[in-house]
Structures are given as structure tokens and as C-alpha cells.
């Protein structure tokens, strides 16, 4: 319609979740017509973040360093590990102020129909991490979706041979809901009222 560069911008914006062609077009027009300075700021911030933020070598959350501050902290409970699907879940739990242990980010959930098995979300690495003997309790805080529940169940079965106490965050997180959209109070209650699984 306008130019190849405009279409490239629209297509680039469509990689964002829940952004369809119309939304991407509206965003592109807004950036170019009403907020060109904001567009340059956005491009710079995106470049900086993409260049300097990567996965923590231990927990797989996001960090600017090789190892994130949470993994490096001696003030956190070294024996308590919370397993989540994404860095957004770490942010949500941290904002609730209800957890003082360490994290492990799977980077997704099991979905055999989509070709996502245990290897694709790093479950062997998690089991290796649990085998070190330092972790005493694991809180499974995968989403309350069918896939999240299946992932939690798989982890429970895969760790039966380990001397680790497995718990699941209490329901209170809506069925079918994702942690990053749950309010802090509900999430805090869910962490405090976690259930024994093993």
C-alpha cells in the first residue's frame, strides 16, 4: 500500500503476541505519524535489550550477566526451587513478594502435538540440577492450562527417584490462566497454599 519499508515495519510488529495485521498497521502508522521520536526510542531500546539480555546459565531466566542476580544471591533459600514456564512467570512471582527461593525457567510446556517434548524444554537439565542434592523442595508453578498441568505431572513422575519434596502451587490461579496475568494477592496465596504432590 505505502512502501516496502512500511510493510517491513508492519510485518516486524506482527511478531508480537496477539498483534494481527490491522493492529500492526495501526501501530506503524502511529509511530510514523504521531510519535517519530518514540519510534527511534523504541528501536534503540529494542536493539539494546536484544544485544545485552540473554538467558541465565543456571535458571534460564533473563539477565544482562552470565548468571542472574537471583541465582547469585546468598540471601535466597538455596534449598527451594520454583519451576515456571517463562521469565514472565518469574517476574509475576517476584512482584507478589511471596517467594524467597531460586527459580528454574523451562521456556515453555510439554505439547506433543506441537513437537515439544521434555528435551525441548530442558527437563533433562532440570533433573540434573535436582540430582545435585542441594534442592529439598520443588514448587511446580507451571500454568493452570492443560499443557501446564501435563508438564507438572510429567515432572512429578520424572523426579520420583529423587529425594526431593514436590509441591504444586495451589489453585487460585484461574483454570486455563497464565501466571503473568494473575494479580499479586492471588499469586501470593497460591504460592503459600501450594499442595504436596509427592
From Swiss-Prot:
Pfam families: RecR_C (PF21175), RecR_HhH (PF21176), RecR_ZnF (PF02132), Toprim_4 (PF13662)
Entry-linked InterPro entries: DNA_Rcmb_RecR (IPR000093), Rcmb_RecR (IPR023627), Rcmb_RecR_Znf (IPR015967), TOPRIM_dom (IPR006171), TOPRIM_RecR (IPR034137)
Key words, A-Z: DNA damage, DNA recombination, DNA repair, Metal-binding, Zinc, Zinc-finger
All copies of domain Toprim, residue ranges: 79-174
Source species of the chain: Acinetobacter baylyi (strain ATCC 33305 / BD413 / ADP1)
Span of zinc fingers (C4-type): 56-71
Function of the molecule: May play a role in DNA repair. It seems to be involved in an RecBC-independent recombinational process of DNA repair. It may act with RecF and RecO.
Protein name, entry field: Recombination protein RecR
HAMAP family: RecR
Keyword Flavoprotein: no
Gene name as annotated: recR
SUPFAM superfamilies listed in its UniProt record: Recombination protein RecR
GO biological process: DNA recombination; DNA repair
NCBIfam families: recR
GO molecular function, one term: DNA binding
